[in-house]
Amino acid sequence: MSADTQSETLEFQAEVQQLLSLMIHSVYSNREVFLRELISNASDAIDKLRFEALQQESLYEDDPELKIRVEADPEARTVTVIDNGIGMSREDVIENLGTIAHSGTRRFLEQLTGDQHKDAQLIGQFGVGFYSAFVVADRVEVYTRKAGAAAAEGVRWSSDGQGAYTVDTVERAERGTAVVLHLPEAQQEFCDDMRLRQIIRKYSDHISVPIEMPVRNADQGDDADSEAEAPQWEIVNRASALWMRPKSEISEEDYQELYKHVAHDFDDPLTWIHNHVEGRQSYVSLLYIPKRPPFDLYEQKPAHGVKLYVRRVFITEDTEHLLPRYLRFVRGVIDSDDLPLNISREMLQHNPMISSLRSASVKRILDRLECMAKNEPEDYATFWQAFGRVFKEGIAEDPGNRERIARLLRFSSTHEEKETPDVSLDDYVARMKDGQEKIYYVTAESFNAARNSPHLEIFRRHGIEVLLLPDPVDEWLVAHLHEYDGKQLASVAKGELDLEALGEEDDKQARQEKEQAYEDLCKRLGETLGERVSEVRVSHRLTDSPACLVVGEYDFGMGMQRLLQAAGHQLPAGQPALEVNPDHSVIERLATESGQRFEDWALTLYEQSLLAEGGQLEDPAAYVRRVNNLLAG
């Protein structure tokens, strides 16, 4: 080789300086990912060697144990990542490291055909991973030799990232590549042995290739003899992707240990779903359902979720792309063989494959929950206690699975009136009365408020079950779940009741007579209450309470109205109706009053009804004075 080709300085192509600046300051805001990217490239190189050696075993030379090594030198402020993979020739170095938008791995993939795609587990589609080194380094050196080449054909590449790089031919006995990062003082933290181990375990723990670091002995001296000794190496990653193994080879303890690692939880999981998928998409998913809710379950962006790997390399924990929000409690791993990534690997590309993977994961989770609800009711009760409130959000978020989600819902009801929600919609439908066509429910701000709602009185008299919905999310649930199994869901606190369906058809004439008898009282009450109510009418739903408030059949429930108002939404004008019980002594007494006492009685009756619905009084002090005056006679 002539002297002219021994050393040369070349300009980066494709406006590399502009792209480097963009990547360093925008894309790679999380600086520690440089190590993930370099280890990923090293893993690619080893995988490429493994594939090539299938046809040419001599490429292993005398070093068949494939590995990645990471070493820091705090005094020199360097971090070195070494692999004994395929390596690069001088031409490879210029082509692959001189252009930001090109990757030897990508070209390698393009040259493969047929089944070879399956065996070549490679990443590096866009070729910017290597340049993440400049996020922390002010100078980078690469020493490499291609497998099968002579030791004299080693190559040294060097650059400060400022627009040019130098390529030299050097003697190199070792096959593979060593990337040496020279760090400025501001990045000194990455020379710390423990810091590097922490990054490796965070991002590269499950790469199937062993990642080694020098053993740090407490009694290791600093004398020349100690420095001359060859370092002892130890594996710092697990070097085994547990989820890739057949289920028959994985113990329950193995599954639980992995869960605690990926979920940062001390408890064992409630259950898990492990699937190997091959076909148009090849991937493995191992999804866990925890026993208890994490502390950040209701935060906009939880700290943990489902980890996405591509060929055992951790990419992201951005669960939003992988599962809908109502399943944000799920933890685990999805490892894809062929999922494409965007240029920074920080976010997933908008790609139909992601949508397909997400849909399949949702289906498997719902399958598991259905199986648990049927065969393991105690475990399902644990799940519902922990995540039922979040899971209910799926009725609004996931219309495609609404029926399946509805089947998994659990409620309290008047059937037993216990606070533990264990009544399914199927249970309710199975207990419906002959001729009953609707599933009745009542919403409230607490279980006791729901159980004691005056709206339930007529239903109790006829033995008709009513679902008790005390969660704030229940208002959203019933706003999107209009029917189940062909039965309409109906609020007992909305509109006028179909009394014939409740077995009240024989009392129709008596009801009409009472409406006429109290027509004048209803009119007087309406005039006194004014715009507080839309109308006052005789109630046919009350048996024990003197009055209640009823919204229109198509209006928001009073609880929903309060939620929307608290969120700053403008609501359409409309007021509830006040229904009075003509058989109650308070109403009979009210009919005999007049003047100020009638007004006090009317306002007290209205405000008591408002309180029973969980509402708030505009002037509590005035209410107390009125009640005291009425008590005083």
Swiss-Prot record:
GO terms for molecular function: ATP binding; ATP hydrolysis activity; ATP-dependent protein folding chaperone; unfolded protein binding. GO terms for cellular component: cytoplasm. Homodimer. This is Chaperone protein HtpG. The lineage of its organism: Bacteria, Pseudomonadati, Pseudomonadota, Gammaproteobacteria, Chromatiales. Residues 563-633 are annotated as: C. It is found in: Cytoplasm. Molecular chaperone. Has ATPase activity. Keywords: ATP-binding, Chaperone, Cytoplasm, Nucleotide-binding, Stress response. The keyword Nucleotide-binding applies. NCBIfam families: PRK05218.1. InterPro entries: HATPase_C_sf, Heat_shock_protein_90_CS, HSP90_C, Hsp90_fam, Hsp90_N, Ribosomal_Su5_D2-typ_SF. Residues 346-562 are annotated as: B. Belongs to the heat shock protein 90 family. Transmembrane segments: none annotated. Residues 1-345 are annotated as: A.
